[in-house]
């Protein structure tokens, strides 16, 4: 559900019904303009085994008119020393941080992050949160999909909870808790999603 919504917003998939607008643009008729203004990090990204971090960043930067300073982004995300390394040689956490850097290279107005801290340890997750909070405070809009409620509480001003592909809640974290019979967002999420009492592998 979450990734499909993201793909519809970006014009990769057509929705069954309704209309979509991002930054005042239609993702199906104005994809080029949207491409220049957004950055995307999908949950699963695959690249050539032998391509290096530097080559991948250079290739990505070449697609945009005014790309961000990717060496600085790599430094901030703690992987600048991997510049000459093949992407296939990176650990899962390093690869995930690289994918976030690639999403930020367009110097976007909106960045889409799909399960951005999957595979990161606790320390690395918090470092990524800190950087994203700084970017958010500078005016970057972050569209985040996540199963980690601690991450949602730290990074999100507004949240949308999906149940079987349908939005069942939209509002702030405090509103979600207030409208549920629980005091924690994780419990409120399970209640809205109809997963109370079920085993959820993502928690």
Task: Place the predicted regions along the sequence by residue.
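Helix-to-loop junction immediately C-terminal to a conserved catalytic motif
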Residues: 10
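Conserved ABC transporter NBD signature motif
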Residues: 18-26, 33-34
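Conserved ABC ATPase "signature" region
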Residues: 58, 62, 67-82
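Conserved ABC ATPase signature
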Residues: 86-90
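Catalytic Walker B motif of ABC-type/P-loop ATPase nucleotide-binding domains
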Residues: 111-114
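ABC ATPase "signature
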Residues: 170-171
